[in-house]
Amino acid sequence: MLHFTAATSRFRLGRERANSVRSDGGWGVLQPVSATFNPPLRGWQRRALVQYLGTQPRDFLAVATPGSGKTSFALRIAAELLRYHTVEQVTVVVPTEHLKVQWAHAAAAHGLSLDPKFANSNPQTSPEYHGVMVTYAQVASHPTLHRVRTEARKTLVVFDEIHHGGDAKTWGDAIREAFGDATRRLALTGTPFRSDDSPIPFVSYQPDADGVLRSQADHTYGYAEALADGVVRPVVFLAYSGQARWRDSAGEEYEARLGEPLSAEQTARAWRTALDPEGEWMPAVITAADRRLRQLRAHVPDAGGMIIASDRTTARAYARLLTTMTAEEPTVVLSDDPGSSARITEFAQGTSRWLVAVRMVSEGVDVPRLSVGVYATNASTPLFFAQAIGRFVRSRRPGETASIFVPSVPNLLQLASALEVQRNHVLGRPHRESAHDPLDGDPATRTQTERGGAERGFTALGADAELDQVIFDGSSFGTATPTGSDEEADYLGIPGLLDAEQMRALLHRRQDEQLRKRAQLQKGATQPATSGASASVHGQLRDLRRELHTLVSIAHHRTGKPHGWIHDERRRRCGGPPIAAATRAQIKARIDALRQLNSERS
C-alpha cells in the first residue's frame, strides 16, 4: 500500500469503511484488487499519484512525454480507486485496436483484468473483469450504450491520448455524452495540443496574458525532465538534404535543394521527390540508417529500426528496398490489414532488425527496442512528429540513444530542434496556419490510400542525398557531406551507449575535426576545389551547389545565425535567381560571397 501523505491516509481510511459492491446483473461484479500488485513507481508517477489522491479530483489531466510511463500511472490510479471502492468499474478509451490489447496486458501487472474484446454488438462482459477497453471510434458509433454502462455503476474513465477526443466534432460530442456522468475521469497525453481549434473534451482552458485560451494540465512531466531523470533516451536527428528534380502536369521540369528557402509548394514537391522509393535519396538514407542500426546492435543486440511511410504503396516499396539492401525481410504493418496487431507484438518481442509502418505504430504502441527511425512521411504537424518520435525514446538501460533520419525540411528541423519545448493546445490562435498550406495538412489523418490533389500530374525525376547536419539537444552539428563519405561514417559510427553529456561532447569534437579538415582543404585554393572535378556541366553545377551548401553550414556554425538568415545575406550581397536556375558563374560568385562572410566572422 501507499503511505505518502496525510491526505492519502484519510482517503484510504474512508474508503475502507465503504460497503461491499453490489452485483448489477449483466454488468458483472467488482473483483477484489490485491495490494500485492504494486509495481515500483518512477519519481514523476509518485508525485502525480500523491497529488491525485490528496485532492481527489473528478477530472485530472496528466501530460507526460511519450515513453515516460503514462499507462502505469493510470493503472495505479485505477487500482487504488477500485481497491477502496471509490469506483466500481473502469473504462479505458484508446485510439487503436492494438492499444486495447497492449493496455490489457499492462493492466495484468497491476492486478487488473480489462476486457480488450468488449464490443458494442455484445455489451456483456465476464464478472471477472474490472473493466473494458474501447476505442474512440467505438464510443462515437454508440455513445448511448456507453452512457448507460457508465451510469449503471461508479466508473473511472481513462482517456489515453485524450487529444483524439477532438478528432471530429461527432467524436467530441459522443465522448461527452457517453462519459459526462462518470464518477472519475483521468485524461492522459504526451502531446496536449492539436493542429486545429477543436476543443479537447474534459480538458480545462484558461486565458493567457493575451486572452488566448490554453489547455491546462494538472500534472506535467516534459521530455527535458524525463531526459535528466534517465527515463527517456537522448535523440540524435540526422538530417539529409539533396538536389531534387521533378516534372509538373504541364511538362515543366524543376530542380530544388531540400533545406534551402523555397516556397511551400516547392518544398512539398522536393520533399515528395526525395521520398520516392524509385529514386536515389531513399536507398541512400536507408543504407545510412541500416549502418547506424548495425553500429547500435554491436552494443544492444536486439535494437530495432522503423521506417514511417506516408501510405501503403510506399511502405511496401520501402520494404522491398530493405529486403534487397539488407538481405532480411522486414516486418510490414498496415493498420487496415488483418494480423497487424499480432505482427507488432511479434516484432516487439523478437530481435529482427526492421519494421515498416504507416500510421499504426506512430502513436502509443510500445516497442521499447526501437532505436533507429527513418521519417519517410510528409506529415509535418507538431502533433504527428512528436508522437512518431515518441516511439523511439523509451529507455531500457543507461546510455541508450535514439537516431532518427529526417529530410532536411525547415518544418521538421524546427520541430527536431524544439523537441524539449512543452506545448499546450491553444484555441483561436490568431495566426493559425492556412488549411491550404501544402505542408500544414497531416497525411496521417487521411486514409492510407488517399492522394492529395497536388500530386496529380506530378512526376518525380530523382534526388541525390547527402548528410546536411546533425541535430542534438536543440543544436546543429556538422557540415554537408556526401553519402558514403568518411565524414558521414564518422557520425554513423557514434558509439551506441552514450549519455547526453558524452553525446554532446563527441558531436562537438566531430564537428571541430570536420571544420578543421574543410579549412585546410580550402586554404591556398585559388579556385573552388571542385571546379574541374567533373567534365559535364551537370556535374560541375552539382559540385558547386554542394560546396555552396557546405559554406552555408560553416557560416551557420561560426555565426550562430539560422540557415535562412545566411541565405538572405548572400542574396543581399550578390542577388541572382534561385540556385536551381543559377549558372556556374553565379554560383561561384555566391561561394565567394559566403567565403567573405565567413572571413568577416572568423
From Swiss-Prot:
A Pfam family reported for this protein in Swiss-Prot or TrEMBL: ResIII
Compositional bias annotation for Basic and acidic residues: 430-439
GO molecular-function terms, A-Z: ATP binding; DNA binding; hydrolase activity
Compositional bias per record (Polar residues), positions renumbered to this chain: 523-534
InterPro entries (alphabetical): Helicase/UvrB_N, Helicase_ATP-bd, Helicase_Restrict-Modif_Enz, P-loop_NTPase
A cellular component term, taken from the record's GO annotations: cytosol
Top-rank lineage group of the source organism: Bacteria
Family indicated by similarity: To M.leprae ML1624.
Name the record gives this protein: Uncharacterized protein Rv2917
